[in-house]
Regions:
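A structural signal for hydrophobic alpha-helical transmembrane segments in multi-pass membrane proteins
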Residues: 143-288, 530-556
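A juxtamembrane structural motif centered on a specific transmembrane helix
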Residues: 504-584
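Forkhead-associated
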Residues: 51-127
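Hydrophobic, glycine- and aromatic-enriched re-entrant/interface helices and adjoining loop segments
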Residues: 287, 291-293, 300, 373-463, ...
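Loop-to-helix entry and N-terminal half of a specific, functionally important transmembrane alpha helix
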Residues: 475-516, 522
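Intrinsically disordered, low-complexity acidic Ser/Thr-rich regulatory segments
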Residues: 1-72, 86, 135-144
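Hydrophobic alpha-helical transmembrane segments
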Residues: 17, 189-194, 242-245, 453-474
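Hydrophobic alpha-helical segments of polytopic membrane proteins
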Residues: 325-344, 348-388
Length: 584
């Protein structure tokens, strides 16, 4: 019997590796290798040249990076913003241009001017004509685009993931104690039901792009395996948190579908995030030098994890708000308060993640390398000050690169992590068969090493590739997002997950200082899991492939323009007095 179990365990290792590679390769093929076909919403006619309008928010200017490039004398690098509302109403705004913007002879003021088909737009002497497209034309263009999942079936990829989960469950059935086996089986069965329920819900919505969710479920499965190895008695709690995380992902995605509603709630979300951090600063107790945990009804959670999603929600911006100084200064102030609060509670790993996201958002807002350089310089000085006043942080930096010199002190965790990772080899020891899981914080801060030990280096690399695939997909999708809000949010969300992964992997291997941050979707912890699934909703918001994302509204009939309609026109002030002037 023992020989049969040993043979089954060995065979399952190879099957898991093959399935992992297949899942990652199929997702890469579907998300990154297929040609991205942009949406077309209108046209701008410049003489005989016809320029497609591919987004709901477009920069018009002379810059090479402009969405609608008009390379003519007098036209500024960033001259105007052309925006489409959720109701199909197009509005043009003047963005600090020197030559001004006129529509049919009327100067564009601070509130912008609504456009209709055939309107002539004067950009500092260069005239272009706006041409909206009919519903029939739009539907024809949309039907010509390739549907997501047509070349690589999401059903087969999810089926492979299900087989992967069953073989992983087999390994736990071999290694787990009999008392814990029912909890482990229940956890994996409910996870399989959850992912197929989510898939079928998307199919009912005529959505065929399920690659990002599949990668998230793949990572969550590995996290479930770590929980089954380290804390099998808490498996039911872990699956409940997973269900809550997926539901929160669906709710966030549904909320993001309405861009105007999303933008209107940025200030309330910012206030809520600051209140959470304030409670964290005032009410939490220090644990190993940090005060980042709150106790509520017998359960502990990290407010900073939930604030991650709020930070991106507040930091992203639509194009018409992007150039407002008040909006930019407000975001900088919000970022400063968040980082200071994280410093006060001693969560410098999360503070670093926030800072990198701040750099990404700042660069996408301004496009200025100088701004990023100044921010990095200021952060370097702040980091030096933190090391000076926080002894436990200084100790971590002192042991960085020297953990083998103090294997029973400052280097205790990293030396064990590296030893366990090396002992797993390429194929691992099998789920639940390692010893690192018994070390403090192994299932959170050193989870990469736990996967290396139990599942082998190949699956650990697949785990990293899953996050990298999401990252490249987010950047690729951002170029085609309907709104700058979705593009900025997707890139910022992915920067958080990337930095989080890098700090976890390289920190546990002593390549970077050990900061104690979690691996996205994999590390045990409800707060982290909730946060990661919420961030995934931002990535889905930028995915404009045909029938791909439930966050993106399908192409539908545009309602008729309303004479004097004002509710959809945003009352933004760009510095001029809004008075009419004669056309040049």
């Amino acid at each position: 019997m023992d020989a049969f179990l040993e043979t089954s365990l060995t065979a399952s290792k190879y099957v898991l590796i093959i399935l992992s590679v297949c899942i990652i390769v199929r997702c890469i093929r579907s998300m990154l290798s297929e040609r991205y076909e942009s949406e077309v919403w209108a046209y701008i006619r410049l003489g005989r040249e016809i320029l497609p309008v591919n987004h709901w928010e477009n920069i018009i200017g002379r810059s090479r990076g402009a969405d609608i490039r008009v390379d003519q004398p007098g036209v500024g690098r960033v001259h105007a913003v052309l925006k489409r509302s959720d109701r199909g109403i197009w509005t043009i705004y003047d963005v600090f241009s020197r030559g001004g913007v006129w529509v049919n002879g009327t100067k564009v003021g601070s509130r912008g001017i609504n456009l209709e088909t055939g309107d002539v737009i004067n950009l500092a002497g260069t005239c272009v004509r706006f041409q909206d497209i009919t519903t029939e034309k739009r539907e024809k263009l949309e039907s010509a685009r390739t549907s997501a999942g047509k070349r690589v079936s999401p059903f087969m990829t999810l089926f492979e993931l299900t087989v992967f989960q069953l073989f992983l469950l087999l390994q736990h059935a071999i290694s787990a104690h009999a008392n814990h086996l029912p909890n482990i089986v229940l956890g994996f069965v409910l996870l399989i039901i959850l992912e197929w329920t989510c898939y079928n819900a998307m199919r009912l919505m005529s959505r065929s792009g399920f690659e990002a969710e599949t990668l998230a479920f793949y990572l969550t499965t590995l996290g479930m395996s770590v929980a089954a190895s380290s804390t099998p008695a808490d498996m039911f709690k872990q699956i409940l948190l997973t269900i809550a995380a997926v539901l929160l992902f669906l709710l966030c995605g549904a909320w993001l579908r309405n861009l105007k509603r999303t933008a209107m709630m940025r200030d309330p979300v910012a206030v809520l995030a600051l209140l959470l951090l304030a409670v964290n600063v005032l009410a939490s107790d220090a644990v190993f030098g940090a005060r980042n945990w709150l106790e509520l009804g017998g359960y502990s959670f990290q407010p900073s994890e939930l604030v991650k999603a709020a930070y991106i929600y507040v930091g992203a911006s639509t194009l018409d708000r992007l150039y407002r100084k008040r909006n930019l200064f407000g975001f900088i102030a919000f970022s400063a308060v968040c980082v200071i609060a994280l410093a006060l509670i001693g969560d410098f790993g999360t503070a670093l993640i926030f800072f990198v996201s701040f750099l990404v958002i700042s660069f996408m807002r301004s496009g200025s390398i100088a701004t990023v350089f100044l921010a990095v310089t200021g952060a370097g000085l702040a980091g030096f000050l933190a090391i000076s006043v926080k002894p436990y942080i200084a100790q971590r930096f002192a042991s960085w690169g020297h953990v083998w010199e103090d294997v029973y002190g400052a280097g205790f965790q990293q030396t064990r992590a590296m030893s366990a990772a090396a002992s797993g080899g390429l194929f691992g020891k099998g789920a639940g068969s390692g010893w690192l899981k018994d070390i403090f914080a192994a299932n959170t801060d050193m989870v990469f090493a736990v996967i290396c030990e139990e599942q082998g280096l190949i699956i650990a690399i697949c785990m990293v590739l899953a996050v990298l695939t999401l990252a490249f997909f987010a950047v690729r999708s951002a170029r085609h997002g309907r709104s700058a809000y979705y593009s900025i949010a997707a890139c910022a969300a992915m920067s958080m997950l990337m930095v989080q992964m890098g700090l976890n992997v390289f920190g546990s291997l002593d390549i970077l200082p050990f900061t104690g941050v979690t691996f996205p979707f994999v590390s045990r912890g409800g707060s982290s899991l909730l946060s990661c699934w919420m961030l995934l909703a931002f990535i889905k918001g930028a995915d404009t492939r045909r029938d791909a994302s439930f966050v993106v509204r399908p192409v539908r009939k545009i309602e008729e323009y309303h004479v004097g309609y004002d509710a959809e026109t945003d009352d933004y002030d760009y510095g001029d007095d809004g008075t009419e002037e004669d056309e040049p």
